[in-house]
Amino acid sequence: MTKEEKNEKEALIEFFSSYRELFEFFCSNTTIHGAIRLVCSRRNRMKTAFWLVLFLVTFGLMYWQFGLLFGQYFSYPVSINLNVNSDKLPFPAVTVCTLNPYRYKAIQNDLQELDKETQRTLYELYKYNSTGVQGWIPNNQRVKRDRAGLPYLLELLPPGSETHRVSRSVIEEELQVKRREWNIGFKLCNETGGDCFYQTYTSGVDAIREWYRFHYINILARVPQEAAIDGEQLENFIFACRFNEESCTKANYSSFHHAIYGNCYTFNQNQSDQSNLWSSSMPGIKNGLTLVLRTEQHDYIPLLSSVAGARVLVHGHKEPAFMDDNGFNIPPGMETSIGMKKETINRLGGKYSDCSEDGSDVDVKNLFQSEYTEQVCVRSCFQAAMVARCGCGYAFYPLSPGDQYCDYNKHKSWGHCYYKLIIEFTSNKLGCFTKCRKPCLVSEYQLTAGYSKWPNRVSQDWVLHTLSRQYNLTDRNGIAKLNIYFEELNYKTILESPTINMAMLLSLLGSQWSLWFGSSVLSVVEMLELVIDFVIIGVMILLHRYYYKKANEGEETTVVPTPAPAFADLEQQVPHIPRGDLSQRQISVVADITPPPAYESLDLRSVGTLSSRSSSMRSNRSYYEENGGRRN
């Protein structure tokens, strides 16, 4: 095989020698519509220019659509899917509070002193006299509050007053003219006394309740957290309890004390044994929870709670009872029926929404013994900020081990710190609402309430007579009835799903590609091949230029040395011959003059003819010799 044949043999991988050759091959063989028009009409420059512009515009529009699709995909939109299911439903937890804060014996004296100071304040500011509060001083005496007693006394403040207290004479004169424009509040200062402000209110009722609440929280910090509610208090509050037409047992509820809403009892919250939780297989009042509650107001704190009845909250089994957020009150002397509808929301996590699966990815420590919720996180965040800023914790929220609740006997300026922290908290300067994300899976209960008078006139006598025999109760305003049930077993499930997933994105991209070029995935591969070949040709051109330039630089800088004459050594080796002996030793040179060969005989086409002539001559010669040199 000659060298030319070896070069003509097809190689395993071949590359184009120029961009023009690559472009012409691609346009002539690609499956992309319109590309062949760029080379088939090259003799007509106008057509070539038209198809080139059309091809580029179409290409640009397609990739503009691609950009829109990718932008929509990477914005991670979600679609809402609503499913309606019907099945046996687990009954939620129900917490009921008395709406009467209890007087602990450990702080009984402190609460009595607070009541006396409150009555002095009411008489001094509003000339109110009540004999229903323990320790009341007769109204015929001039009441002056002892500033050596409780700190942070209530004061009347003129409009615009922020840092000073107005004298009593000025107050009495001005109140006769513009009573509505005056505010009431109490002064709070930091530890050094250099930073002070008034916590003011336009309503005297709100101011007195908040002032009383502030001191009550301070006193409550001295109560041991292990203080339990005895069984006698439960029987005095809940007269009857039935679920699914069966009586409740002590295993069905747990109790705790709330500083504002009093003694609270939670039904159906047995986190240790989920098998004992209630469930409803039928809708209706008979298949729900029915409670008969006492709503009398005896031996409680009237200045802290001004509402009669009971506080109710429906929540999840593993969620804490935040009575001040989602709870509602039921009135005394009425039957309140609460119908429920369950709704489950399942959000997509990750890049699709800012939700948390279990709170482990949230930078806030959960202080509650419960599962993660947004409210749990927000309160834990506030408590952590208060402990860090004020040196003590809020009495309504749990603490980390080693921390203490706020008491102005130990923490003198905690009130000043607390009210300023509340302002930062509500304006999200603490960042709690930003840090705390919604849980991805949430179960909510949509509630509808109905009220009716209970007991009615016909049954009032015998119902109250029976209750008076058992519980010494004779007033219909001292009882209330509560029904909580499922209106229907159909529950909604709201699911989030990606609006554009990967399969849909590929489908949309393929649709756009087919719309603008009428091609397929193989056409995309051809485009990739074109790009790869383009890059390879560019690399080859650069390498060729590099090595060519390097070779030229080497030829210019290289100096070739002149070799020594080769005959020098020969002269030394040739022996000296005397001039007289030259005649005897002369060498005769005979030139052989031979004509050049006939190059016409080298013609390959005449090889066959010459060989045939030679063979003919040899045959004739042999014949002539055999016949003795005779010719025919």
UniProtKB/Swiss-Prot annotation:
Superkingdom in the source lineage: Eukaryota
Keywords assigned: Cell membrane, Cell projection, Cilium, Cytoplasm, Cytoplasmic vesicle, Disulfide bond, Flagellum, Ion channel, Ion transport, Membrane, Sodium, Sodium channel, Sodium transport, Transmembrane, Transmembrane helix, Transport
Compositionally biased spans, kind Low complexity: 612-622
Spans annotated as Disordered: 612-632
Record's catalysed reaction(s): Na(+)(in) = Na(+)(out)
Recorded GO CC terms: acrosomal vesicle; apical plasma membrane; ciliary membrane; cytoplasm; motile cilium; plasma membrane; sodium channel complex
Transmembrane segments: 50-70, 521-541
Localization in the cell: Apical cell membrane; Cell projection, Cilium; Cytoplasmic granule; Cytoplasm
Disulfide bond entries: 97-264, 189-196, 241-248, 355-440, 377-417, 377-436, 381-432, 390-417, 390-440, 392-406
Regulation: Originally identified and characterized by its inhibition by the diuretic drug amiloride.
Keyword Nucleus: no
Pfam family, one: ASC
Membrane-side (Cytoplasmic) residue stretches: 1-49, 542-632
Recorded GO MF terms: ligand-gated sodium channel activity
Membrane-related topology note: Multi-pass membrane protein
Basic and acidic residues bias spans: 623-632
InterPro entries recorded: ENaC, ENaC_chordates, ENaC_CS
GO terms, biological process: multicellular organismal-level water homeostasis; sodium ion homeostasis; sodium ion transmembrane transport
Extracellular side: 71-520
Function: This is one of the three pore-forming subunits of the heterotrimeric epithelial sodium channel (ENaC), a critical regulator of sodium balance and fluid homeostasis. ENaC operates in epithelial tissues, where it mediates the electrodiffusion of sodium ions from extracellular fluid through the apical membrane of cells, with water following osmotically. It plays a key role in maintaining sodium homeostasis through electrogenic sodium reabsorption in the kidneys.
Similarity annotation: Belongs to the amiloride-sensitive sodium channel (TC 1.A.6) family. SCNN1A subfamily.
Subunit record text: Heterotrimer; containing an alpha/SCNN1A, a beta/SCNN1B and a gamma/SCNN1G subunit. Interacts with shroom1.
Protein name per its UniProtKB record: Epithelial sodium channel subunit alpha
Source organism of this protein record: Xenopus laevis
